[in-house]
Amino acid sequence: MATFSLCMIVKNEERVLARCLDSVADLMDEIIIVDTGSTDATKEIAARYTDKIYDFTWVGDFAAARNYSFEKATMDYIYAPDADEVLDEANHEELAKLKQVLLPEVEIVQMKYATVTEYNTVLNAATEYRPKLFKRQRSFTWVDPIHETVRLEPVVFDSDIVIHHMPEQLHSKRDFSIFEKTIEKEGVLSDKLTKMYAMELMKTGDLEDLQRAFLWFEQLYATTDNPQHREYGACVLAKCYRLQQDGYGLLKVALKEVATNPCSEVCYELAQYYLGQHDPREASLWFLNAFSETEAVLDVHAGGDGALQGLKRCYETLLGQELTQEERAYFQEQLQEAEEAISLWEMPAE
C-alpha cells in the first residue's frame, strides 16, 4: 500500500482548515503544514492534527511556498490540497481505495476539481482535472528498443475522485497583486499566466483592476504574434473601455475582432455597452451573437447564461416601451425563449 504525505500551505485559514483536514487526515501517513504568516488560530488548529508545522516567510510566490512544503515530505506520494477543499464521504472512500491499489509506476494522479459557482474565478466547466497527488521520488527509465531515450513525460492517472473547492470569499484581489508584481519584476507572463490573468479580469475584475492591467494588455494586443494572446488582450481592453464608458475605444478594438474571428466576450461587451446607452434593440443583437454565433475563450458565462440574462433584460426593457402589436408579440415570444434557455443552461461538465 502506498504512503501519503499531505503538504499544505496556509495563512489565516482558521475558518476552513479543520473541515479540510477532517475529510482526509485518516488517509495520510504524515501531515505537513507550512504557514506563511497567519495571525489567527490557524497554527493552533493545525497542531491538533500534526506536529510538523513550519513557518515560511511569504515572498509573494505560491510556488516557492509549495516547494518548501514538498521538501519536508517523506512518504511515497504527496497530496497537495488547499485549506478550502473538502473530500466528501464518497470521494474519501475512493481515495482510500486508490491508496490500496495505486501502482508504483504512476507518478501523478489527477482529480476532478469542482468549485462553488459563486466564487469560481477560473473554471469554465463544472469540473476540471487537476494534478493533486505526486510521487515524491521519480525514477527515470529508458524507452524504445533502438535510438533509446529517457522517458520525460510523467505517468499520469486520471481518477474519478472529485475534490470540492469551497472558498468563503473571492481571492481575485490577491491574485491581481501577484500578477502585477510578476509583470513588474519579469516584464512578461507565461502563456498559462497570461490566460489566467485575462480570465480573472473578465470574470471578476472591476474598473480599478482593469485600469491597472490596461497598459500591459494594450502592449500585448498591439505587439504579440500569438493569436490567442491577441484575443485575450482584445477581451480585456474591450471590458476596460466599456467600464470607462469609452465607446470609441471599445468600438476600435471590437470592430477589428468582429471583422475576423470574434469571441463571445467581445460581443458581450458590445452588448453591455449598447444596453448602457439605452439601446436594447442593438444590445439584443450582440447578446444573441455572444450566445449563439461565437465561442467563449475566457469566460463561459459571456457566451452562456450571462448573454441569456442580457437578452432577457433587453426584451423586458423593450416590452416596457411603446410598440406595435406585432413587435410586442415578437418580443414577448423572444422573452419566453430566453427565459426557457436560462432555465436549461448548465456549465459544461468538463
In which residue ranges do the predicted regions lie?
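Acidic helix N-cap motif at the loop->helix transition within catalytic regions
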Residues: 15-18, 40-49
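Catalytic-site signature of metal-activated, phosphate-bearing donor transferases
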Residues: 64-70, 81, 88-208, 212-217
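N-proximal low-complexity "stem/linker" segments adjacent to membrane-targeting elements
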Residues: 1-23, 350
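Short aromatic/hydrophobic "clamp" motif used to bind/position activated sugar donors
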Residues: 78
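A conserved acidic beta->alpha catalytic loop
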Residues: 23, 35-45, 58, 82
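Conserved donor nucleotide-binding strand/loop of the catalytic core
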Residues: 44-68, 72
